[in-house]
């Protein structure tokens, strides 16, 4: 009779002869793999484990080497579920990092972290693959031109304008409108955008990947009749996937974007939702690898991981990458290490406010917390800069007066302060805007407002030219002419 132990020893000895490693320990998504002397895989090499589980079903798991433990053992993180794996199973070292298909054949398709299609439209017919771990461009290759990236969203274009070829972060807690704002930007920008887009779904709900996919199909960014004419590639790693997949799905999306920038020399527009999930996945992996946690339980390598991923998605002289990233803010605390580390890499931060969302002001962009490196008079022009500063000063004064108003009421304010409050409330309402992607819920058609129209509108409110119009006339309108027309309609209704 052959015991299980002797059978396992026999299997392992055969694998060693064939120069294939074997699993010695499994702790959830983390595996220890032993290899023959002198044949240890390098850090980031991918290992492939194939076999059958006890029920006889085929298993195919890809892992990435994270640590060299000594004694010819490595520790690897699985990119898919480890259900059914057993000690002693063979692990083949591919001799290189994980590589994914890149190029035009990825457009219109949804891939996972391994570059495998998950949209039931057959395999991706690509002969070109890139490794997901690549160096950031050298300083000499970087593009330093400064130009505004118009979005058609009033409050964004005026107060915290985006830089073409820059990095943009949408910061907000749960349920304040980050994903809707990303979908609105896809609608406003990706349609008119001459290059291609890459959408990276990092550890979010499946629904939040499905909604943009349907939106892209409706707006013909994804062409169902002729998939090769699509303008976007999608890479998803949802919440239910192991931390290894959630940690690396952003690298897969970056790799696809880099191909379009470096090889095709195109302008690329990557959307990443959500950066915090990437950090959380890294935190899970870090704990499983036995590293000492840092502040608030995050991984000690948070700054390094964030830097290496952010520095890759940058603009070079070959092509620009304008990345738009949603950043979930835990407990609405912007000083949390994850959003604080992310903001250091960004050219513009759009902060979404729960207070504004509660008032029904959408997009709920906070005019005082949102920042942009482009908000300089020598970049945006004196007129734009002065208007934006006027809006911020009025909003700041209104914020300072709110405690007094809450305790004593408006009547106790000076005439000048009452006037400031009235204008600030009109500015707040004029900052709202009907959304294209929310048309089905609101029933009001979306509006795209040019930067010149936006500046003109706020310039009329600030000095008091429109003091005679009621506040509600400014709510959910496009340009200032629509507000005037709405005021006239409200007056007729009142009579």
Swiss-Prot record:
Keywords: ATP synthesis, ATP-binding, CF(1), Chloroplast, Hydrogen ion transport, Ion transport, Membrane, Nucleotide-binding, Plastid, Thylakoid, Translocase, Transport. Coiled coil: none annotated. Belongs to the ATPase alpha/beta chains family. NCBIfam families: atpD. It holds the Pfam family ATP-synt_VA_C. PANTHER family: ATP SYNTHASE, ATP SYNTHASE SUBUNIT BETA, MITOCHONDRIAL. One of its GO terms (molecular function) is proton-transporting ATP synthase activity, rotational mechanism. Gene3D superfamilies: 2.40.10.170, Bovine Mitochondrial F1-atpase, Atp Synthase Beta Chain, Chain D, domain 3 (1.10.1140.10), P-loop containing nucleotide triphosphate hydrolases (3.40.50.300). F-type ATPases have 2 components, CF(1) - the catalytic core - and CF(0) - the membrane proton channel. CF(1) has five subunits: alpha(3), beta(3), gamma(1), delta(1), epsilon(1). CF(0) has four main subunits: a(1), b(1), b'(1) and c(9-12). It comes from the Eukaryota. It is a peripheral membrane protein. ATP binds at residues 172-179. This is ATP synthase subunit beta, chloroplastic. It is found in: Plastid, Chloroplast thylakoid membrane. It comes from Pteridium aquilinum. One of its GO terms (biological process) is proton motive force-driven mitochondrial ATP synthesis. HAMAP family: ATP_synth_beta_bact. It catalyses: ATP + H2O + 4 H(+)(in) = ADP + phosphate + 5 H(+)(out). SUPFAM superfamilies: C-terminal domain of alpha and beta subunits of F1 ATP synthase, N-terminal domain of alpha and beta subunits of F1 ATP synthase, P-loop containing nucleoside triphosphate hydrolases. One of its GO terms (cellular component) is mitochondrion. Its EC number is 7.1.2.2. CDD domains: ATP-synt_F1_beta_C (cd18110), ATP-synt_F1_beta_N (cd18115), F1-ATPase_beta_CD (cd01133). The lineage of its organism: Eukaryota, Viridiplantae, Streptophyta, Embryophyta, Tracheophyta. Produces ATP from ADP in the presence of a proton gradient across the membrane. The catalytic sites are hosted primarily by the beta subunits.
